């Protein structure tokens, strides 16, 4: 058993358009809305209970509350169910109400009280003037018929306004889709522009790197020029040194020639000295012969002295002269020997000095020749390195010129593309601004139209309410009711119910087809069997920050 305290839960279901009186033997339509966050199930049901009933088992009849397919837990859903005529309670003074019971047996909402009663006969009549014809004629029709016609006209006008509203909302949706498409295009253009800006920045950085490389190459070129100038100065210095070495070589050659001349002179002097020595040797040989002859003579004289001792005194004078001559010959021989030794020493010293000078001169000539060869090789290596540096410099200069030209062409092309993108971006921004203005105008027009529709709906709702109150208050003549089929309804009420059901369906379609406009629920209570006013959805205010 469920207590009555469960009838009003925190998140309740709102029942709409509950009439105080329902006609028996006719279908009853129940409209309700489920709140945000409510979990719906196919096992939920709506029942008709007596007001004083406390248990959910004591229901008169029930139908399953099937949720719509497009509904969700995060939205408010407007639903309706129908109770067939043959399941409804009998007419009387007993009060009933609708209860929404979920799958767990909890009551999630209940409606206002109502009763089932027979309709009263229509006793009131309305007098109408015939405006179409020129005759003065009065038409007397039942007030219910007149009000029914007025209700049909109002419903037709309201349906037309709803169709116009739907058309405008579809147009607004198309405009919003177009705006979203243009915004996506603009975003793509902005992304491409951003990528091109990054490419331009990359190219600028590359250009800066190229400029830095060019400056570095310029510095290297300046260093190479300084090195070339330095090498040229060194080459000039080496040329001067080579000229000096050539001069020294020429002086050495002159010295060599003079030494050779001296050598020739010394050779001549040596030849003369040799001749003189030979002459002196001949003289020494002659003197030796003379000495030998003198010695022979001395030996003969000594023999003669031995033999002729007595002739010693006589020949003493001859002996003295001979001794003096011998002494002179010895002195001359000693002088000649001394002269010969001096000449030989001088010859040997001259020959040694000449060989030393010749050897030193040959060594100096070889050293000078080696130095000249080394200088020539160094000159050739310097010329080759200078030629290689010149060729390398020319190659670097050509490469630098080619890279500079290519980068200049690429930079000009990127600048041109950047200018085109900037102009395209300006055009896109202008189109975006124009679309914003168009959207603002459309939204303002939609707001004004919504306000007009709200006003018309309120007016129609008030008129319909008044009409329905007047219809329910009328006492029509007794209408024939066919009880053969419990599903049949009275003709007038069936026509009104069908028209009001069409209006309700239009309102339901409008509510379902407008997901972009959040609605505020208004609990509207009018007479049954069908609702007159629907849940209106005001358009959201345009937020300029969403752009």
From Swiss-Prot:
Alphabetical UniProt keywords: Coiled coil, Cytoplasm, Nucleus
Subcellular location: Cytoplasm; Nucleus
Molecular function (Gene Ontology), one example: transcription coactivator activity
UniProt xrefs under Pfam families: CALCOCO1 (PF07888), SKICH (PF17751)
Gene Ontology cellular component list: cytoplasm; nucleus
Membrane among keywords: no
Keyword flag Cytoplasm: yes
Gene3D superfamilies: 2.60.40.2840
Region of interest (Disordered), residue spans: 473-498
Coiled coil residues, start to end: 143-305, 356-469
Function of the molecule: May function as a coactivator for aryl hydrocarbon and nuclear receptors.
Protein name as it appears in the record: Calcium-binding and coiled-coil domain-containing protein 1-B
UniProt source species: Xenopus laevis
């Amino acid at each position: 058993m469920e207590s009555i305290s469960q009838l009003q839960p925190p998140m309740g279901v709102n029942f709409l358009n509950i009439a105080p009186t329902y006609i028996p033997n006719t279908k009853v339509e129940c409209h309700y809305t489920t709140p945000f966050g409510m979990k719906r199930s196919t096992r939920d049901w709506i029942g008709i209970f007596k007001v004083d009933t406390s248990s959910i088992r004591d229901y008169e009849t029930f139908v399953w509350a099937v949720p719509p397919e497009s509904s969700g837990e995060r939205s408010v859903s407007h639903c309706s169910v129908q109770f067939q005529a043959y399941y409804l309670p009998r007419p009387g003074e007993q009060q009933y109400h609708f209860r929404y019971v979920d799958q767990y047996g909890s009551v999630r909402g209940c409606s206002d009280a109502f009763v089932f009663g027979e309709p009263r006969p229509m006793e009131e009549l309305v007098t109408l003037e015939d405006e179409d014809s020129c005759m003065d004629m009065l038409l007397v029709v039942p007030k219910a018929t007149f009000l029914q016609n007025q209700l049909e006209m109002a419903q037709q006008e309201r349906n037309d306004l709803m169709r116009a509203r739907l058309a405008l909302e579809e147009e607004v949706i198309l405009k919003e889709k177009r705006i979203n498409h243009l915004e996506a295009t603009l975003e793509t253009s902005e992304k491409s522009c951003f990528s091109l800006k990054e490419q331009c920045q990359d190219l600028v950085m590359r250009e800066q790197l190229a400029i830095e490389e060019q400056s570095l190459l310029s510095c290297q070129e300046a260093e190479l020029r300084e090195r070339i100038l330095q090498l040229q100065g060194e080459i000039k210095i080496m040329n001067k040194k080579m000229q000096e070495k050539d001069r020294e070589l020429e002086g050495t050659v002159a010295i060599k020639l003079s030494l050779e001349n001296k050598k020739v002179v010394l050779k001549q002097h040596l030849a003369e000295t040799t001749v003189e020595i030979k002459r002196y040797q001949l003289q020494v040989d002659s003197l030796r012969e003379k000495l030998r002859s003198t010695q022979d003579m001395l030996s003969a004289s000594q023999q003669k002295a031995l033999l002729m001792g007595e002739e010693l005194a006589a020949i003493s004078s001859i002996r003295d002269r001979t001794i003096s001559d011998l002494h002179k010959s010895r002195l001359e021989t000693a002088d000649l020997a001394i002269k010969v030794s001096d000449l030989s020493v001088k010859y040997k010293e001259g020959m040694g000095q000449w060989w030393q000078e010749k050897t030193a001169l040959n060594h100096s000539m070889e050293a000078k020749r080696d130095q000249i060869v080394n200088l020539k090789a160094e000159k050739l290596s310097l010329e080759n390195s200078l030629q290689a540096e010149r060729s390398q410099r020319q190659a670097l200069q050509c490469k630098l010129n080619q890279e500079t030209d290519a980068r200049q062409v690429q930079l000009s092309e990127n600048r041109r593309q950047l200018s085109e993108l900037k102009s395209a971006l300006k055009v896109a921004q202008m189109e975006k601004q124009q679309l914003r203005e168009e959207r603002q105008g459309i939204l303002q027009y939609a707001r004004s139209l919504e306000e007009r529709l709200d006003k018309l709906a309120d007016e129609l709702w008030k008129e319909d309410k008044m009409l329905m109150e007047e219809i329910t208050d009328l006492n029509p003549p007794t209408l024939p009711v066919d009880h053969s089929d419990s599903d049949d309804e009275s003709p007038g009420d069936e026509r009104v119910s069908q028209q009001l059901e069409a209006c309700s369906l239009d309102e339901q379609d409008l509510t379902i087809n407008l997901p972009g406009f959040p609605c505020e629920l208004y609990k509207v209570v009018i007479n049954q069997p069908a609702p007159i006013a629907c849940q209106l959805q005001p358009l959201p205010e345009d937020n300029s920050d969403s752009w």
